[in-house]
Design a protein with these regions (language model features):
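Alpha/beta-hydrolase fold catalytic core
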Residues: 1-68, 92-94, 134, 320-342
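Conserved HGGG/HGGXW glycine-rich cap/lid loop of the alpha/beta-hydrolase fold
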Residues: 58-106
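Active-site loop/oxyanion-hole signature of alpha/beta-hydrolase fold enzymes
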Residues: 84, 88, 97-139, 305, ...
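Conserved hydrolase catalytic core segment
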Residues: 133-177
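Conserved alpha/beta-hydrolase catalytic His-Asp/Glu region
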Residues: 174-178, 199-260
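Short beta-strand/loop motif that positions the catalytic acidic residue
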Residues: 262, 268-270
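Acidic catalytic loop of the alpha/beta-hydrolase fold
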Residues: 272-277, 302
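Catalytic active-site module of serine/aspartate enzymes centered on a nucleophile-bearing elbow/loop
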Residues: 290-342
Length: 342
């Protein structure tokens, strides 16, 4: 009975531990506030996609020319909120649309969706076709920029010109997950242990520290409002599913070959002090395609659109107006598409 008694004690202790973790997870979920959806102006709308409702904001409907579609990156709490310092400003001259990727922000977060780079490439393509009018300019960041590159390569008729902020998938985040990734994904999707791991990773302290040390050069830009929004968004029901796929490697996107083939005019944007996607990597990527140019923002890490919004918005406005003029000139010449400089 001694060994049997010890086994039962261990089992009961383990069960109590799991129950305690479950209680903590439930408490965190209850305390999470609703994220703020008013950071971007315009009208809130829903796009009924095959895997769920996609939330987006739209403004500048009366402005002429092609629309700008904003595509955010991947991370806990990340959403179209990240474009709050750009959306309204550019809406003065352009029709602008910013949407939350499936699994993020206010979009649906189905647990059984096949979260992957392919899924997001398909979502972006469908959004441009069915919501943006069939052709658009794109502003995208990180892995979102990599997905945009694939869209522009696979469906060139959908994309006119792009601004790509530190696209991932060049020499990192470019491999498919193996058995270890699949096993890790299974662990992260477990109701108790996976949720507990996620809650630690997406705690207010973790979010604040990551933003201060990795995302922003000036830590003072990591405001309490920003941290509160990222935390609230990251703890909406189902928010862990897409992040589990990301951390397991399922959202990785090898975009080098696609980038080299692109015919659309594009600007690469990089923060001079960015350590995750340094300028040297952007220079190497630039060498793959002579149609691209590079703009480097000093005193900046990953978030030039937030650290230097005036400069970023001026760049975007000038660039897309230039490409719209080039496109209209090409149409008058009798060609449907034309690349600037040709």
């Amino acid at each position: 009975m001694g060994k049997l008694g010890n086994w039962w004690k261990t089992l009961l202790a383990g069960g109590a531990g799991v129950a305690a973790l479950a209680a903590v997870n439930a408490s965190i979920q209850r305390r999470a506030l609703e994220p703020d959806d008013s950071a971007l102006g315009g009208e809130a709308k829903l796009f009924a996609w095959k895997y769920g409702q996609i939330f987006y904001k739209e403004a500048g409907l009366d402005n002429p020319g092609l629309p700008i579609v904003f595509i955010h990156g991947i991370g806990a709490g990340v959403s179209s909120f990240m474009w709050r310092k750009n959306f309204d400003d550019l809406a003065q001259d352009f029709r602008v649309l910013a949407f939350d990727l499936l699994g993020f922000g206010f979009s649906d977060k189905p647990p059984a969706a096949p979260y992957s780079a392919d899924l997001y490439v398909e979502l972006i393509s469908d959004f441009i076709r069915e919501v943006a009018g069939g052709r658009a300019n794109i502003v995208a960041s990180s892995l979102g920029a990599s997905y945009a590159v694939r869209v522009a390569d696979e469906h060139p008729e959908l994309v006119n010109a792009m601004i790509l902020n530190a696209p991932a998938g060049y020499d990192t985040m470019n491999t498919r997950p193996g058995m270890a990734g699949a096993a890790f994904y299974g662990l992260l999707q477990s109701p108790v242990l996976g949720t507990s791991f996620y809650n630690v990773m997406a705690s207010e302290r973790s979010i604040r520290d990551y933003a201060r040390h990795t995302l922003f050069y000036d830590y003072r830009r990591v405001t309490s409002r920003l941290v509160a929004h990222l935390y609230a968004t990251s703890h909406q029901p189902g928010a862990q599913h897409a992040i589990a796929a990301f951390m397991s490697g399922y959202l990785n996107c090898d975009m080098s070959a696609a980038f080299a083939r692109l015919v659309q005019p594009m600007v690469l944007v990089s923060g001079k002090q960015d350590v995750s996607t340094p300028v040297a990597k952007m220079m190497a990527l630039l060498n793959l395609n002579p149609r691209a140019r590079l703009e480097v923002f000093d005193f900046c890490r990953v978030m030039p659109e937030q650290e230097h919004p005036e400069k970023f918005n001026a760049l975007a406005s000038e660039w897309f107006k230039q490409q719209t003029y080039t496109d209209q000139r090409a149409e008058r010449a009798g060609t449907k598409y034309r690349v600037a400089g040709e």
